[in-house]
């Protein structure tokens, strides 16, 4: 039978062939049975095989019938559907003829669609997929793409013949195939014809009439097409063309039923806009799409998305060729016409930029558009501009009715975000914020996105003045960042100029035009605009200035500038005087600018113009142009284009007599160049002299401006160039008469420092700031030229150099007498004289270098003499006068001896190096430790001597050792100043502090036998008694007690805490006390020692450096001493009386009022005591009289008592002397008093001295006069010339004149004559002692006794710093009534200013500044005092001590806010130099205290200052453990006190606290900023800031995100995180590098996946809420890291404070961070920008390498159950995936099918 059927198939007759097919099917049914279904596992019979074979037959009838037979078998239930379907698909790849199979396949699919659609049991869409299982037609097309015509044919029939009731099913069953055909990413060309042809079939309406009712098939098909549209590719020309055809067909189909498809039409309108942009870029054509948009305007009406389309039109117009613009302009006009009678949308103003660009374009473009119908582009543009100008603009507060979930391109995201930003920046504060953020980012980008530019142009057009300057500034910076925007900007500026504005705004806009000339291409357009302005006569002056500004940007404009300047010179009768004046001013200003900007290129061209202006402008009211061109001349001279001297020679005939203030001011400024242009010629030096004379003359000009300019110019000259001849005559010092000078001497014309200060008295208040600047230059120059050695010598102490020949000869005289003496009785006196003045000359070679051999010999001589003096100096406890000065004599001698021996040691080492006995390294080491070697050598020698010798030797040894301790300590301090405060520790030598402690402990053990020292002792000075106590001789105890006063400078430097201990010890041993010494002499010396100790503390100004507790202790000790002094029942209180005298004398110079009152009361008490002392011993009276003389002199010199009271006491002493002529103490006291009062200007005292001196000399030189009478006269004589001046701390320099020198020389000659001639041993011995004492007191400067000098008297007389400090002292003594604060400030400010850069030479700054701080000089003086203390604290312990007092309560509470702010900010400079207690008090009572308010800081500036100081202090290198702990604790406390919610104007506080935390360890940071419910916002901000700066790794954000998910205001935290992530990208740090960011983002994606699939637990928050927040953070990271375009639009900034200092404390600045409308929009629009940014990010390295991971993650998150993830978020993920459809990784079928939902 099969053979028969085969024959029939071959028979060429269709009827026979059809019958054969019927027979074959019957055979198949027979073979398989009627009841059994044919399926896959059924035996393949011959008939069945033949049937399958003939389905591919060459005969069309056979294959068609066979295929239909197979379908019939399925339809009748004889074969399974899947069997036949799979059989057809299996035959597809190899079949010769496919028509039958495809037809059968279509029949099967139709059958399946009908069956499944009717049953409704199974969703038809679930039957097939694109990939698994694939829709059968996909398989066919993939295997046989050549069969597309057959497919098209059958598909056409399929859709046309589809029953109405199954239309939806038929479309659904074809949906996978259609998705594959149109949306497959590769978009194969071989399918193109099928796609295009099939589209017409799909969208063909069912009815004949277009108005027919919408069929189900049509509805389903259009819905399918609309859903496919976002997935279509538009990568190349072919794809874009297909997309355009596709969207046109779909759009036209939708338009047939616009009412039904209103929503889709609205969405498709926006899609059309996006396609237009892509089409423009690829094809250059989009007019057909624009026509579609036009059609939908009428149809959609109010539902048309006008705002978004208008923004899109504006963007398209900017990038569209002119030929394409007309349809868009028509569309825009139609859109705006819809709103007639209503407010047009605010967004419509964005059209202005392209419209103005069209209007400003050339006519050439219109020539190219010839033949077009209707209005031209310019006419349309003009119509639109008119509409925009006439109509009012709406608020656009309504929301967009339709929002695209899946836009076809990124344009939609930009449009929508721009619309949102536009909506929110209408408010002034939001505008300012957005502009500030844009401004901060312009430096990071070179391409400005057009929508950002449009928004800026909108703001420029709409602004009414509030933000105009900011807008114009951003405009200028935008032009610099992207010069391609300039042509668009210029028409907008011109448009703005055409609107009504205030004159200032017009000016700002005009001067913005030249700043846009950033590229040569833009210059022509700007130049034309400026030239157009110049055609108006009233604007010619402005035009010239604009041209000059443009020339500054582009030198190529110079010819035009020259031409316009020449034209402006031409006289014009039509122009008024006012306009001529403006032109002249403009010309002069332009000349100045040309000279300043490019003096070398064009300066020479301007000389003629300068000369012309100077010649023309000679009248008083024409000074301004002349001054302007002189400024230009200033620039030419500065650039050395012209010679300043020659220039002045040419100008001086015209200008030397010019009295116009403005000209004089400008000339002074010109002359400030003279020092910097110096030429080494005589002519130039003469010129400089002329200039100086000119400037000094005009410092006294009555016009403050001229005088100020003169002083400012003088500040540029060297201080040495000013002479006393320059000074005004009123303040000029007396000049020496030339005839009185020696032949070799020249007249010294240098100005003493004090003379500069006299300028204060003749300077007008308004000129004082300029004088201050001049003083500052003097101070700075002096510090620059300050000799390095001055620091060393000042700390070391020294002698005055102004000694006469007679005084200088004393040491040699005593030395020769000592060496030739053969009388044992003279030995003690000679030893005393040697102690006071022994010194040997320094030996130097011809080149001024010391001779090493002789220096070594000098050192050995000093060593031998030291040991001899220890043995020979006589110590007698009963000699009270010598007891006062012996310690000081030893200190002066040991100072000379130590340095001489040290120099000798260094010289010996140099000799050893020269002779090769030592290597260079060994010598270098020994040189560096020589000062310690000398210390130890002398210590050994002194202690060895003291071990075996008498009590007198021990006493001298103690004084020598104590003096050595002082000298070594000072030397160490000077070394520290030389080595910037750091001395290398020497392991082979005992540290100085420990060695000094040994000396001190030894003294204390000797004074108090019960004292238990903590360290080692020098045991050679005492011995153990049987009871185990340390005992020493009375002389040793007395010497130890008085030696303690020598160590006061050491206590001040290193161990101030010992002061209290010593005061208590000495006070306890006063006469009459339970612990008083058994020895009467020791009791006397204890009182003297306490007085000496107190006097030295007063001399050190300890009360100015210490707190109230120390002052109370000093007064308590003084009270105890005075109690003993005035207690008549005590027998051995003469030492107390002397001690009181010494203490009160020094206390007189205190600035404390209570101290001065106390001195006055005690003086009167002493005077009364003297009156009542008739019954006392002669010694008692001598001591009392001497004490009275010292206190009286000091009190008078300090102004405590009047001249009359001093005269009364002087008369009382004179009477005593007359009645007791042989009493040395009385004569000494009277001489002392007369000298002191004379020095202080007491006339009667000077008269008395002139009478006493000759009478006493006569007594001394009278042969045979009684010895005691001569001795008294000798004491009186030396006192008359100041032998005891050191006790009273008088400045004897006041009478260092020739008359005083003559009197001094006369006394010295008298003493030497007594020593040489007298035969009385006792008289000779005393005379020698007195002569040495007089030498020391004449030469010594009291700075050698104090730890640091009390002032700068050791600086030369010409020193301005010395004079300034003297002025401070005067102010401190006389108060603000005598020294006005305004003048004091002029002197103090330079010292404070220069002190910031230099460390001043040593001085007791606490004593200098403390009175000024306490007296009522005002806040400014107080601050300057503290500024000096702060800057000098590193090198000045006294400054640090003063500062320490004022940074603690109670003093700190009395300071003003400004001073407190300064102390807070400057804390890093001084924190390491005050005590732990003081810095702790400062931190607790000020730094932390300012934050302690209920809700917000009461003084934001104070808080900010506190944090600035704290953050800088935490950066200090190597802080102490206490300081570091204190700072960390303060940081934590301040963080806790800051409000959780961050106000904008407080943001800097949080940044500052974050900077503080950044200095701590990670553990410390986490501990302080641990996130809790109450502090989450501030803790989050701090961590985010640290992450953004790279201080913390990005991975540390995990805990923050976990906490943030539970926070109710997540948007606030999201805003912070967004900014942090963006700034992490900008900051260059290892922790914020791109790989670290990639790692963190992948980690975040994993975290999100775990939460989505419930792998990671979350608490207190719904999963969908947590996922939404984390998706927002993911989007933030992607947007922040993809590019700068989206951040620029969104308002992200390059810093946390882009708006810094733009808003005051109120208004928008007070808003909470992250909560403003602008901030909310920023966060929300991050999601809109995600699809675009994700594509950009994955196209960059190294992100592109992880593209597959990102795609897989997006797919996995998108596919989680709906209830776990909101639909809106899923749409966002899908849109993001669709944006990646151009990437290679997306083209994998497994990827794109999942992305499309298949």
Curated annotation (Swiss-Prot):
Keywords on record: Acetylation, Cell junction, Cytoplasm
Tissue/organ expression: Expressed by glial and neuronal cells in brain.
Biological-process GO terms, alphabetical: regulation of post-transcriptional gene silencing
Entry's localization field: Cell junction, Focal adhesion; Cytoplasm, Cytosol
Superkingdom classification of source: Eukaryota
Cross-referenced SUPFAM superfamilies: ARM repeat (SSF48371)
GO cellular component: cytosol; focal adhesion
Principal subcellular localisation of the protein: other
Modified residues (N6-acetyllysine): 816
Family matches, as InterPro entries: ARM-type_fold, FOCAD/RST1_DUF3730, Focadhesin/RST1, Focadhesin_C
Function: Required for the maintenance of SKIC2 and SKIC3 proteostatic levels in the liver. May be involved in the regulation of RNA degradation by the exosome complex. Potential tumor suppressor in gliomas.
Self-association state and partner proteins as the record states: Interacts with VCL.
PANTHER family: FOCADHESIN, FOCADHESIN FAMILY MEMBER
Name used for this protein in its record: Focadhesin
Gene label: Focad
């Amino acid at each position: 039978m099969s053979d028969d059927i085969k024959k029939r198939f071959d028979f060429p007759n269709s009827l026979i062939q059809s019958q054969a097919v019927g027979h074959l099917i019957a055979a198949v049914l027979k073979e398989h049975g009627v009841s059994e279904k044919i399926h896959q596992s059924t035996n393949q019979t011959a008939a069945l095989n033949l049937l399958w074979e003939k389905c591919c037959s060459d005969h069309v009838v056979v294959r068609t019938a066979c295929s239909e037979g197979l379908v019939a078998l399925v339809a009748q239930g004889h074969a399974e559907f899947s069997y036949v379907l799979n059989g057809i698909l299996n035959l597809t790849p190899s079949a010769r003829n496919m028509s039958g199979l495809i037809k059968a396949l279509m029949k099967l699919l139709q059958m399946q669609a009908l069956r499944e659609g009717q049953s409704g049991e199974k969703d038809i869409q679930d039957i097939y997929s694109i990939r698994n299982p694939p829709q059968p037609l996909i398989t066919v097309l993939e295997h046989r793409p050549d069969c597309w015509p057959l497919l098209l044919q059958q598909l056409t029939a399929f859709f046309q013949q589809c029953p109405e009731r199954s239309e939806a099913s038929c479309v659904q069953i074809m949906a996978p195939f259609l998705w594959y055909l149109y949306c497959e990413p590769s978009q194969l060309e071989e399918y193109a014809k099928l796609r295009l042809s099939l589209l017409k079939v799909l969208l063909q309406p069912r009815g004949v009439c277009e108005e027919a009712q919408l069929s189900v098939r049509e509805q389903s098909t259009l819905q399918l097409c609309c859903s496919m549209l976002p997935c279509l590719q538009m990568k190349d020309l072919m794809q874009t063309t297909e997309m355009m055809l596709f969207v046109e067909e779909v759009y036209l189909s939708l338009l047939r039923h616009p009412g039904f498809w209103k929503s889709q039409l609205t969405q498709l309108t926006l899609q059309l806009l996006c396609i237009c942009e892509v089409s423009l870029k690829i094809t250059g054509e989009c007019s057909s799409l624009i026509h579609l948009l036009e059609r939908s305007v009428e149809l959609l009406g109010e539902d048309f998305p006008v705002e978004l389309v208008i923004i899109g039109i504006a963007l398209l117009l900017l990038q569209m060729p002119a030929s394409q613009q007309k349809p868009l302009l028509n569309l825009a006009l139609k859109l705006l016409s819809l709103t007639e009678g209503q407010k047009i949308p605010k967004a419509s103003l964005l059209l202005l930029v392209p419209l103005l660009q069209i209007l400003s374009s050339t006519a050439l473009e219109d020539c190219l558009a010839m033949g077009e119908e209707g209005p031209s582009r310019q006419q349309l543009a003009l119509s639109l501009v008119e509409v925009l100008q006439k109509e009012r603009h709406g608020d656009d507060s309504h929301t967009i009715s339709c929002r695209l979930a899946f836009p076809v391109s990124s344009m939609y995201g930009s449009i929508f975000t721009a619309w949102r930003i536009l909506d929110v920046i209408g408010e002034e504060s939001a505008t300012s914020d957005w502009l500030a953020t844009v401004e901060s980012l312009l430096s990071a980008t070179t391409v400005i996105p057009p929508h950002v530019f449009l928004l800026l142009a909108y703001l420029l057009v709409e602004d009414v003045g509030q933000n105009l300057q900011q807008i114009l500034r951003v405009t200028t910076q935008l032009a610099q960042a992207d010069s391609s925007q300039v042509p668009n900007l210029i028409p907008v500026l011109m448009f703005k100029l055409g609107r009504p504005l205030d004159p200032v705004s017009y000016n700002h806009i005009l001067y913005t035009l030249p700043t846009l000339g950033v590229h040569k291409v833009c210059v022509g357009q700007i130049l034309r605009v400026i030239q157009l302005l110049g055609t108006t006569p009233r604007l010619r002056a402005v035009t010239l200035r604009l041209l000059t500004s443009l020339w500054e940007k582009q030198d190529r404009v110079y010819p035009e500038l020259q031409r316009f300047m020449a034209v402006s010179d031409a006289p014009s009768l039509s122009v008024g005087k006012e306009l001529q004046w403006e032109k002249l001013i403009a010309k002069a200003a332009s000349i100045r600018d040309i000279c300043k900007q490019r003096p070398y290129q064009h300066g020479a061209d301007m000389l003629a113009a300068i000369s012309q202006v100077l010649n023309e402008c000679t009248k008083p009211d024409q000074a301004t142009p002349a001054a302007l061109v002189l400024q230009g001349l200033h620039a030419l001279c500065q650039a050395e284009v012209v010679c300043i001297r020659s220039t002045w020679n040419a100008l001086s005939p015209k200008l030397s007599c010019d009295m116009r203030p403005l000209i004089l001011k400008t000339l002074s400024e010109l002359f400030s160049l003279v020092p910097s242009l110096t030429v080494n010629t005589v002519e130039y030096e003469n010129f400089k002299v002329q200039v100086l004379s000119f400037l000094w003359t005009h410092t006294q000009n009555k016009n403050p401006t001229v005088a100020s300019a003169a002083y400012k110019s003088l500040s540029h000259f060297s201080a040495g160039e000013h002479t006393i001849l320059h000074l005004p005559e009123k303040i000029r010092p007396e000049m020496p008469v030339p005839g009185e000078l020696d032949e070799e001497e020249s007249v010294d014309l240098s100005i003493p420092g004090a003379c500069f200060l006299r300028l204060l008295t003749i300077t007008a208040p308004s000129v004082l700031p300029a004088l201050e600047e001049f003083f500052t230059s003097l101070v700075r120059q002096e510090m620059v030229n300050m000799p390095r050695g001055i620091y060393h010598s000042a700390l070391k102490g020294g002698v005055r150099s102004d000694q006469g020949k007679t005084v200088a000869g004393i040491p040699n005289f005593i030395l020769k007498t000592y060496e030739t003496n053969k009388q044992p009785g003279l030995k003690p006196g000679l030893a005393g004289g040697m102690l006071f003045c022994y010194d040997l000359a320094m030996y130097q070679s011809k080149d001024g270098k010391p001779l090493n051999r002789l220096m070594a010999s000098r050192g050995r001589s000093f060593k031998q003499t030291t040991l001899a003096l220890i043995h020979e100096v006589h110590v007698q406890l009963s000699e009270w006068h010598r007891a006062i000065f012996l310690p000081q004599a030893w200190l002066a001698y040991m100072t000379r001896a130590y340095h001489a021996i040290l120099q000798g040691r260094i010289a010996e080492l140099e000799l050893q190096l020269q002779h090769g006995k030592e290597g260079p390294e060994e010598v270098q080491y020994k040189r560096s430790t020589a000062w310690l070697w000398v210390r130890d050598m002398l210590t050994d020698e002194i202690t060895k001597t003291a071990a075996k010798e008498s009590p007198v030797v021990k006493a001298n040894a103690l004084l020598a050792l104590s003096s050595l301790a002082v000298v070594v300590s000072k030397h160490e301090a000077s070394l520290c100043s030389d080595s910037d405060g750091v001395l290398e520790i020497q392991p082979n030598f005992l540290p100085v502090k420990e060695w000094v402690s040994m000396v001190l402990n030894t003294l204390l053990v000797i004074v108090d036998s019960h004292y238990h020292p903590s360290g080692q002792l020098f045991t050679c000075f005492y011995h153990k008694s049987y009871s185990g106590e340390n005992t020493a001789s009375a002389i040793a105890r007395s010497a130890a007690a008085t030696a303690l006063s020598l160590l006061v400078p050491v206590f001040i430097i290193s161990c101030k805490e010992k002061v209290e201990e010593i005061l208590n010890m000495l006070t306890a041993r006063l006469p009459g006390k339970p612990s008083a010494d058994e020895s009467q002499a020791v009791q006397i010396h204890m009182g003297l020692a306490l007085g000496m100790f107190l006097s030295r503390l007063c001399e050190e100004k300890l009360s100015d450096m210490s707190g109230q507790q120390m002052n109370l202790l000093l007064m308590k000790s003084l009270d105890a001493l005075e109690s003993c002094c005035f207690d008549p029942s005590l027998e051995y209180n003469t030492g107390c009386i002397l001690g009181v005298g010494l203490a009160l004398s020094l206390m007189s110079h205190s600035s404390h009022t209570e101290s001065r009152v106390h001195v006055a009361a005690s003086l009167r008490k002493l005077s009364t005591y003297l009156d009542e002392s008739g019954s006392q011993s002669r010694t008692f009276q001598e001591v009392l009289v001497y004490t009275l003389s010292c206190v009286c002199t000091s009190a008078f010199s300090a102004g405590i008592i009047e001249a009359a009271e001093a005269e009364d006491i002087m008369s009382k002493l004179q009477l005593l002397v007359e009645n007791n002529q042989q009493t040395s103490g009385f004569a000494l006291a009277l001489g002392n008093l007369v000298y002191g009062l004379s020095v202080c200007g007491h006339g009667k005292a000077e008269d008395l001295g002139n009478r006493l001196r000759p009478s006493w000399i006569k007594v001394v030189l009278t042969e045979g006069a009684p010895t005691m009478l001569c001795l008294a006269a000798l004491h009186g004589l030396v006192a008359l010339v100041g032998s005891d001046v050191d006790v009273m701390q008088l400045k004897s320099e006041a009478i260092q004149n020739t008359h005083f020198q003559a009197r001094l020389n006369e006394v010295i000659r008298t003493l030497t004559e007594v020593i040489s001639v007298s035969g009385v041993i006792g008289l000779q011995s005393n005379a020698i002692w007195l002569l040495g004492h007089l030498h020391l007191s004449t030469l010594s400067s009291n700075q050698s006794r104090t730890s640091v000098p009390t002032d700068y008297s050791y600086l030369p007389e010409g020193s301005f710093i010395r004079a300034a400090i003297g002025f401070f002292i005067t102010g401190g003594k006389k108060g603000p009534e005598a020294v006005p604060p305004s003048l004091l400030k002029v002197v103090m400010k330079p010292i404070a200013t220069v002190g910031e850069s230099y460390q001043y030479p040593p001085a007791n700054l606490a004593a200098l500044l403390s009175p000024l701080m306490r007296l009522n000089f005002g806040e400014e003086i107080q601050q300057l005092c503290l500024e000096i203390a702060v800057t000098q604290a590193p090198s000045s312990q006294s400054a640090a001590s003063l500062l320490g007092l004022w940074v603690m309560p109670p003093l700190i509470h009395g300071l003003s806010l400004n001073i407190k702010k300064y102390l807070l900010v400057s804390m890093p400079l001084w924190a390491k130099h005050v005590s732990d207690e003081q810095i702790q008090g400062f931190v607790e009572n000020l730094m932390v205290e300012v934050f302690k308010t209920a809700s917000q800081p009461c003084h934001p500036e104070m808080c900010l200052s506190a944090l600035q100081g704290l953050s800088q202090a935490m950066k200090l290198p190597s802080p102490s453990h206490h300081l570091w702990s204190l700072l960390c604790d303060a940081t934590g406390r301040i963080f806790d006190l800051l409000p959780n919610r961050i106000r904008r104007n407080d943001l800097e506080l949080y940044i500052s606290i974050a900077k503080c935390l950044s200095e701590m360890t990670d553990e410390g940071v986490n501990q302080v900023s641990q996130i809790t419910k109450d502090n989450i916002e501030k803790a989050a901000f701090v961590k985010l800031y640290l992450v953004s700066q790279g201080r913390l790794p990005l991975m540390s954000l995990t805990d923050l995100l976990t906490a943030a998910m539970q926070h109710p205001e997540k948007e606030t935290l999201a805003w912070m995180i967004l900014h942090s992530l963006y700034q992490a990208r900008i900051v260059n740090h290892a922790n914020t590098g791109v790989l670290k960011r990639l790692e963190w983002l992948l980690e975040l994606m994993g975290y999100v996946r775990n939460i989505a699939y419930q792998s990671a637990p979350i608490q207190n928050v719904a999963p969908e809420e947590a996922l939404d927040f984390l998706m927002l953070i993911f989007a933030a990271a992607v947007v922040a890291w993809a590019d700068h375009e989206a951040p620029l639009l969104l308002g992200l900034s390059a810093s946390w404070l882009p708006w810094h200092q733009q808003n005051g404390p109120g208004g928008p600045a007070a808003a909470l961070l992250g909560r403003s409308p602008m901030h909310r929009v920023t966060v929300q629009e991050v999601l809109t920008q995600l699809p675009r940014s994700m594509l950009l990010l994955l196209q960059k390295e190294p992100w592109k390498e992880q593209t597959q991971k990102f795609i897989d993650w997006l797919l996995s998150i998108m596919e989680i159950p709906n209830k776990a993830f909101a639909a809106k978020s899923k749409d966002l993920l899908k849109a993001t995936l669709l944006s990646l459809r151009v990437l290679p990784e997306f083209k994998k079928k497994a990827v794109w099918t999942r992305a499309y939902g298949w």
